[in-house]
Curated annotation (Swiss-Prot):
Alphabetized InterPro entries for the sequence: Asp/Glu/hydantoin_racemase, Asp/Glu_race, Hydantoin_racemase-like, Iso_Racemase_Enz_sf
Domain of life: Eukaryota
GO CC annotation, single: nucleus
Cystine bridges: none
Name used for this protein in its record: Uncharacterized protein C1F7.10
GO function term, MF aspect, one: amino-acid racemase activity
One Pfam family from the record: Asp_Glu_race
Species of origin: Schizosaccharomyces pombe (strain 972 / ATCC 24843)
Length: 238
């Protein structure tokens, strides 16, 4: 049995439960998912670089006190979250974030990838994170923001949120030229159907949480691990 730890790096339990409700219905065979929400001293949402740094520090302290007994890590935050790099430096076990998993999956399915996300502040942050993966603008159509804060995805009226998601997805396709769309927030995990209805049956909608689970399960099955030669070598080993 492959054990994957799905980490919500914010302290909002409702977001963890939302991701769990989707993943529990599509877990691959012989895979066991375990879930961890950031302890209460962490941020309630990841809305800026500082939030990411804070949550990574809180979670790494948690792992010092509670060594993880799993085969892989999925960081369920759509950002270039520092916890991904920190876990890769600390463990040999495969680790990915949902941003990385969704982009790699999307590039297997189309030629122009766009991300529908939350606040406008995330547009440059996600653009920088995706470029840091080595993804060029020849295949990256850009970031389309709804203007909603992550927690507003569930706190605002459902019809209002759905309408914003639909309009933003259509903008990504019609104005930005996207032929694949990634859900740019873990809080959108249960909203893929809204975008699918808006853009029609020819545009794949990628949920990074699902893509991340499938990617990590494949890496573990192939007995692959995080490279320890280079940037992810153990601290102090060079």
């Amino acid at each position: 049995m492959i054990r994957i730890l799905v980490i919500n790096p914010n302290s909002t339990v409702q977001m963890t439960e939302s991701v769990k409700s989707v993943l529990d219905d599509c877990t691959p065979p012989n895979v066991q998912l375990e879930y961890l929400t950031c302890p209460p001293e962490g941020p309630k949402a990841i809305e800026c670089v500082s939030d990411g740094v804070r949550s990574a520090a809180v979670l790494m302290k948690y792992f010092e006190d509670h060594p993880p007994q799993v085969d892989a890590f999925l960081v369920s935050c759509y950002s270039d979250h520092p916890l991904v790099t920190t876990l890769r430096e600390t463990y040999r076990k495969p680790c990915t974030g949902i941003m990385q998993a969704s982009i790699l999956t999307a590039l297997s399915l189309g030629r122009k990838v766009s991300v529908v996300t939350t606040t406008k502040r995330y547009e440059p942050l996600l653009t920088d994170g995706i470029h840091a993966m080595g993804i060029s603008d020849s295949v990256f159509a850009g970031i389309a923001s709804t203007g909603l804060a992550p927690l507003e995805l569930d706190s605002k009226p459902r019809a209002e949120v759905d309408a914003l998601l639909a309009r933003t997805a259509l903008r990504a396709v019609n104005e930005m030229g996207a032929d694949v769309i990634c859900l740019g927030c873990a809080g959108m995990t249960h909203m893929a159907h809204v975008l699918e209805k808006a853009v029609g049956p020819n545009i794949p909608i990628i949920d990074g949480t699902k893509a991340g689970v499938e990617l990590l399960a494949s890496l573990v099955r192939m007995n692959l691990f995080t490279s320890k030669q280079g940037v992810y070598q153990a601290v102090g080993s060079d």
